[in-house]
């Protein structure tokens, strides 16, 4: 059956700021306390979406979350009206204010893990929400992510959206950032590659930075998504690269159809994995970048592998990269050599995503890949599909509500909270989502 890949990109939230919340993510740590520009950030993301849509790629949007997230502060014992709580936490525990104000939901590669209908035992598209258990600010996301996905993938005859795994370290799940699918045509059965950093009885794990994804979680997600057991491979990421800042597999590898583009040090038993894939995937091609051409540290600094690998109608592939790759002489030299060689990657497109990149999120972090047949695509909420009208409307929306300068101290401004809620109220109407945010369901009571 004919199917296409649709990229659902996350809209950057109004509280996008640099707080260094993500230990193991070196860009996040390095840019802590810098001044951010939320309006520029959301527009950089929108420009990427629109450019790819104009080039013929199917593109959609996923909204940001409600931030600052007052319900989490109430859970932590702060009381009073919303404004009183903001004032208290800013004075008593400002780090908590930053955590509940993170715009991290924009990196929707961590929103869920997707199984196309061609791979599922029941013939449905499955999406399992990620619990993001390793970081408090990200563990807040799952309930609203689930509500958003249910509002986008509404037709229960076509889609099954599963709640996140229990919030325990044993089942730490980071979503599609640790998942790749390989195969031929999108509509044909493929091989799903689940990548983990640790498993309970395996002492091989990183020493410096946490391994966020467990094998136990990956196995549970595969079961929830009803992936045919004959179409699954579980592989461990190289713990040494996790300790060099590769906190998700999509920082060191990306796949599309029959191609796996990765660093030669990406996986723990890479030769074994490559041989498995060669046996299981017709026409499989591994493009392994040697360390002598691009070091792991340069790959992390430029996000070479946190790229999008997209299929054109003629079967050739486009590699979508952050500008940092072009700015690095060695990486750019390698990329020009890559497109000149005999492989499906024949073109490169560079985008300026510096606002997201400074927090450790490149092109691949910003998108969730969902393979859909024509019938399934017609069942998706049409209001989220990118087109000229939506692009214009979202830019006008951003101009109205987003600030062009934000510091950690600004998060205590009650006006920012009100601006954010008003903006999301307008956005849910624009995208026909219904009442998906807690403030819409409670009337934002002052408690």
UniProtKB/Swiss-Prot annotation:
Belongs to the succinylarginine dihydrolase family. The keyword Metal-binding does not apply. NCBIfam families: arg_catab_astB, PRK13281.1. Gene3D superfamilies: Succinylarginine dihydrolase (3.75.10.20). GO terms for biological process: arginine catabolic process to glutamate; arginine catabolic process to succinate. Pfam families: AstB. This is N-succinylarginine dihydrolase. Catalyzes the hydrolysis of N(2)-succinylarginine into N(2)-succinylornithine, ammonia and CO(2). The active site is at residues 174, 248, 365. Substrate binds at residues 19-28, 110, 137-138, 212, 250, 359. It comes from Salmonella gallinarum (strain 287/91 / NCTC 13346). Keywords: Arginine metabolism, Hydrolase. It catalyses: N(2)-succinyl-L-arginine + 2 H2O + 2 H(+) = N(2)-succinyl-L-ornithine + 2 NH4(+) + CO2. Pathway: Amino-acid degradation; L-arginine degradation via AST pathway; L-glutamate and succinate from L-arginine: step 2/5. It comes from the Bacteria. It is an enzyme of class 3 (hydrolase). GO terms for molecular function: N-succinylarginine dihydrolase activity. Homodimer. Its EC number is 3.5.3.23. InterPro entries: AstB_sf, SuccinylArg_d-Hdrlase_AstB.
């Amino acid at each position: 059956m004919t199917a296409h890949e649709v990229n659902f990109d996350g809209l950057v939230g109004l509280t996008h700021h640099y707080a260094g919340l993500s230990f193991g993510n070196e860009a996040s740590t390095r840019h802590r306390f810098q001044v951010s520009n939320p309006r520029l950030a959301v527009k950089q993301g929108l420009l990427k979406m629109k450019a790819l849509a104009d080039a013929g790629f199917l593109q959609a949007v996923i909204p940001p979350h409600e931030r600052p997230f007052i319900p989490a502060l109430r859970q932590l014992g702060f009381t009073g009206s919303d404004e009183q709580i903001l004032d208290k936490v800013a004075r008593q525990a400002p780090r908590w204010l930053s955590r509940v104000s993170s715009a991290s939901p924009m990196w929707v590669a961590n929103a869920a893990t997707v199984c196309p209908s061609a791979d599922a035992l029941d013939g449905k598209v499955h999406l399992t929400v990620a619990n993001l258990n390793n970081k408090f600010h990200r563990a807040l996301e799952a309930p609203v992510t689930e509500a958003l996905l249910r509002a986008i993938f509404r037709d229960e005859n076509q889609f099954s959206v599963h709640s996140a795994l229990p919030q325990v370290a044993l089942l730490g799940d980071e979503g599609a950032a640790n998942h790749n699918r390989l195969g031929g045509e999108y509509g044909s059965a493929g091989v799903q590659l689940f990548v983990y950093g640790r498993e309970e009885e395996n002492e091989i794990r990183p020493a410096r930075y946490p391994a966020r994804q467990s094998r136990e979680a990956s196995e549970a997600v595969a079961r929830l998504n009803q992936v045919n057991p004959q179409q699954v491979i579980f592989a461990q990421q190289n713990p040494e690269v996790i300790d060099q800042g590769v906190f998700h597999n999509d920082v060191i590898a990306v796949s599309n159809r029959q191609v796996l583009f990765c660093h030669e040090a990406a996986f723990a038993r890479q030769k074994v994995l490559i041989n498995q894939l060669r046996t299981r995937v017709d026409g499989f091609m591994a493009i392994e970048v040697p360390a002598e051409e691009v070091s792991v540290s340069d790959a992390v600094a430029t996000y070479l592998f946190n790229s999008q690998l997209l299929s054109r109608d003629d079967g050739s592939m486009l590699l979508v990269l952050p500008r940092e790759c072009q700015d690095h002489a060695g990486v750019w030299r390698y990329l020009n050599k890559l497109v000149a060689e005999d492989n499906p990657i024949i073109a490169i497109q560079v985008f300026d995503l510096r606002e997201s990149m400074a927090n450790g999120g490149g092109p691949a972090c910003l998108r969730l890949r969902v393979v859909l047949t024509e019938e399934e695509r017609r069942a998706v909420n049409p209001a989220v599909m990118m087109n000229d009208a939506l692009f214009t409307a979202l830019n006008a929306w951003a101009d109205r509500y987003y600030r062009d300068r934000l510091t950690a101290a600004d998060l205590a401004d009650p006006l920012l909270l009100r601006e954010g809620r008003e903006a999301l109220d307008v956005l849910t109407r624009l995208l026909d989502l219904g009442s998906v945010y807690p403030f819409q369901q409670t009337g934002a009571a002052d408690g």
